[in-house]
Regions:
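Conserved active-site segments centered on acidic
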Residues: 1-60, 124-127
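Phosphate-binding/catalytic loops
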Residues: 63, 69-127
Length: 127
């Protein structure tokens, strides 16, 4: 998303972050096959340690996108979502479905395409 926003010259209008809903990956860097997919599509990234979503994230960010029903349920249970900030990423593209987790499927390309489809729709409606 950062690259899409930068390419559209709207960097000043967005602050983008990523966080896990569980604590099982906290501190881990980007999964190596995910890095390969990012490189293939010229998406810049840097070494980082995963972090868990915080109460401050819900207060601070205008939109919180999740990729599967379990994360949607967990996030809404945690935050209540009175402001309607939390939504399934594919719903942005008009599809009420999960984005398959490439950790389990091994299909990082399909996941990349789904994410791009959804974010392109979101960004086209935001500008």
């Amino acid at each position: 998303m950062k690259k899409m926003v930068k390419d559209a010259r709207h960097e000043e209008e967005f602050e983008i972050s990523s966080a896990a809903t569980s604590d099982e990956v906290i501190g881990y860097d980007i999964y190596p096959p995910a890095k390969e997919c990012l490189r293939k599509h010229d998406i810049p990234f840097q070494k980082r340690g995963a972090r868990q979503v915080t109460d401050e994230d819900y207060s601070y960010y205008d939109h919180i996108f999740v990729m599967d029903w379990a994360n949607l349920r967990d996030m809404k249970r945690r935050f209540g979502d009175e402001k309607g900030k939390i939504q399934m990423l594919m719903s942005l593209a008009g599809e009420e479905r999960e984005i398959p987790d490439p950790w389990y499927t091994g299909d990082f390309e399909s996941t990349y395409r789904d994410i791009c489809t959804s974010l392109n729709k979101f960004l086209s409606e935001s500008f």
